[in-house]
A protein has these predicted regions:
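Bacterial Sec-dependent N-terminal signal peptides
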Residues: 1-25
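Carbohydrate-active catalytic/glycan-binding domains of CAZyme proteins
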Residues: 21-356
């Protein structure tokens, strides 16, 4: 009798262990949200050579503080302009790479202000592209409040997506307010005809400009203007653009970045220059999961109609505006080409290895 009970108990343990292992394996096949630890924001997601990459803003310390090694006299002087001491921590960019969306490798300080002499703090919202075998990382720096301050949008270059990135032109690419747009939150967009554009802007204004061939400046439009305003209704910051089936989708963030209602909306047009009429929100908080879901990017899997939205959000156990995490969820379109509201999840997305 004791032997039978022992066998029954052992069998039950095996069943429980197998079920637990199967559940763990099932969970391991998904990314989970957040996809990697740390307080990060404004993530740029992209694919290079069958590898997923994410370039976020360093939002706050998570465990051991991460810092740049030191600052020049010019950088220390420029740091006195900051409107928020928290921004003084944001002097570098860390990157993350993955082969399958579930296991991420950290690449520390792919960009650091030691390699950008005019940049001193508020290194924000990186955007990256590859051109002619080089990688170009666009970034905001110094959070300028007026045209008399040093800073704006910069561009750095490297031979590899993991850097190290060094200053490309030795000065900001955009260093002033045009059309009342603060020079932050830049996105480099390659059109189907090969033309590269810079789309950017804070303070509720969004601009677009045509980049020249070597990314050292801009090519004026036919009317001689360098930047055109494409600001849609309710725009705040965080511009992003994709194309799908001949349509241009301008996406942006609305609301206050420190609050629960931070969100993403979008518009559609037949041209990257607009006009863009707001359609509605595509990403926002779920009070049961997380708040402040915003400042996003989009990953499109080549040769498919599969799309992922990469974004930051704030966990429910904190109201600190700087405590943001990078998450990934699926993004879908309806039969008419409109973006369906994204369901934010704790599970994240399924493991996916890119085909060679």
């Amino acid at each position: 009798m004791k032997k039978s009970r022992f066998l029954l108990f052992t069998s039950m343990l095996l069943v429980f262990w197998n079920a637990s292992f199967a559940q763990q394996k099932k969970q391991a096949e998904r990314s989970g949200n957040p996809v990697f630890p740390g307080w990060y924001a404004d993530p740029e997601g992209i694919i290079f050579d069958n590898t997923y990459w994410i370039y976020p803003t360093y939002s706050d310390d998570y465990g051991k503080p991460d810092r740049s090694a030191g600052f020049s006299e010019l950088q220390l002087k420029t740091q006195k302009n900051t409107i928020n001491p928290q921004y003084l921590k944001q002097t570098f960019i860390n990157a993350f790479s993955s082969k399958d969306l579930t296991h991420w490798e950290k690449h520390p300080h792919v960009l650091d202000i030691k390699d950008v002499k005019w940049a001193a703090y508020s290194i924000w919202a990186p955007s990256i592209t590859r051109k002619d075998g080089k990688y170009y990382l666009f970034f905001g720096a110094n959070d300028i409040q007026n045209n008399n301050q040093l800073g704006g949008i910069g561009v750095a270059v490297a031979d590899k997506p993991a850097g190290p990135f060094i200053d490309h032109i030795g000065k900001p690419l955009v260093d002033k307010f045009y059309n009342n747009a603060q020079p932050i939150d830049q996105f480099v967009f390659k059109d189907t005809d090969g033309q590269y554009y810079l789309i950017y802007g804070g303070w509720r204004h969004c601009n677009i400009g045509k980049l020249n061939k070597d990314f050292t400046g801009f090519v004026p439009f036919k009317d001689s203007t360098v930047f055109k305003s494409i600001t849609p209704e309710n725009y705040v910051e965080g511009a992003y653009m994709i194309t799908r089936k001949g349509k241009y989708y301008l996406m942006w963030s609305e609301g206050n970045w420190t609050g629960p209602d931070y969100s993403v909306a979008y518009a559609m047009s037949d041209s990257p220059l607009g006009p863009f009429k707001r359609i509605g929100k595509v990403l926002q908080q779920d009070p049961a999961i997380a708040t402040g879901a915003g400042h996003h990017s989009v990953i499109h899997v080549p040769n498919t109609d599969d799309w992922y939205i990469v974004y930051h959000r704030r966990p429910l156990n904190t109201t600190d505006g700087n405590h943001r995490e990078v998450c990934i969820d699926r993004m879908y379109f309806d039969k008419n080409g409109f973006i369906l509201p994204v369901k934010i999840t704790n599970e994240g997305v399924e493991k996916r290895v890119l085909k060679r």
